[in-house]
Amino acid sequence: MLKYRPFEMHCHTRHSDGTFLVPQLIESVAAYGYAGLALTDHNAVTGLLEVTEELQRKNNCLVLPGIEWTTFYGHLLVIGCDRFVDWRFVTPDTIDEALQEIRAAGGIAGVAHPCEVGSPLMCGCNW
């Protein structure tokens, strides 16, 4: 029988535009009863360097490696890749190839803000 384990799949730390330090975020997510989180800072994976097995074990909180690709064409959550997949030059014409590369790296991807219609700062999803 499958067991439901709630996860926070889209969160940021001070490594991009969040307010929490990595340990604070993990502690907060665990305090709310989540089993884990995907650390998805904007165009940064440096926060993952602060995630330790001890921190996860102490809080009973699994941390999935992720990143939020933040481009002029939209924001894409990329979770679970075993290597870096370059987002810097992805365009609507090359998104299919980028998605194939994410999959080849063992990752999954999803639109970060599917209902955002766009603004000068948040371009929505124009993939």
Q: How should these model regions be labeled?
A:
Residues M1-I108, A112, S119-W127:
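A metal-dependent hydrolase metal-coordination microenvironment
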